């Protein structure tokens, strides 16, 4: 497992190298795509990316939790959480450790 992290800048650089847009246009493209994904999730829509996975927002109800140190019961407020469900192809690819060709 790697300690490295893929950043927005890394994505923009990959678009620059692989697509041939300028660095500025590549960065704008990445920001635009991420913005559209974020906006859809804020509206409560699912975002399905073929062969990758599905992002969705789930509403979690209020429930009773427990403080592990004291054992005291505490209410956990209702909230919205972001969920990602990888596609079967992505699961298989990660399990096999296969990198993308190209």
Swiss-Prot record:
Pfam family, one: Bac_DNA_binding
Keyword Transcription regulation tagged: yes
Keyword Hydrolase annotated: no
UniProtKB keywords: DNA recombination, DNA-binding, Transcription, Transcription regulation, Translation regulation
GO molecular function: DNA binding; structural constituent of chromatin
Assigned GO CC terms: cytosol
GO biological process terms on file: DNA recombination; positive regulation of metabolic process; regulation of DNA-templated transcription; regulation of translation
Disulfide partners: none
Entry superkingdom: Bacteria
Function: This protein is one of the two subunits of integration host factor, a specific DNA-binding protein that functions in genetic recombination as well as in transcriptional and translational control.
NCBIfam families registered for this protein in UniProt: himA (TIGR00987), PRK00285.1 (NF001401)
Subunit structure comment from the entry: Heterodimer of an alpha and a beta chain.
Sequence similarity: Belongs to the bacterial histone-like protein family.
Name the UniProt record assigns to this protein: Integration host factor subunit alpha
Naturally occurring in which organism (per UniProt): Paracoccus denitrificans (strain Pd 1222)
């Amino acid at each position: 497992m790697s300690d490295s992290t893929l950043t927005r800048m890394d994505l923009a650089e990959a678009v620059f190298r692989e697509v041939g847009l300028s660095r500025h246009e590549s960065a704008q493209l990445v920001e635009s795509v991420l913005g559209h994904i974020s906006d859809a999730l804020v509206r409560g829509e699912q975002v399905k990316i073929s062969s990758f996975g599905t992002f969705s927002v789930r509403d979690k109800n209020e429930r009773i939790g427990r403080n592990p140190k004291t054992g005291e019961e505490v209410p956990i407020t209702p909230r919205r959480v972001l969920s990602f469900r990888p596609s079967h192809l992505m699961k298989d690819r990660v399990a096999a450790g296969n990198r993308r060709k190209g």
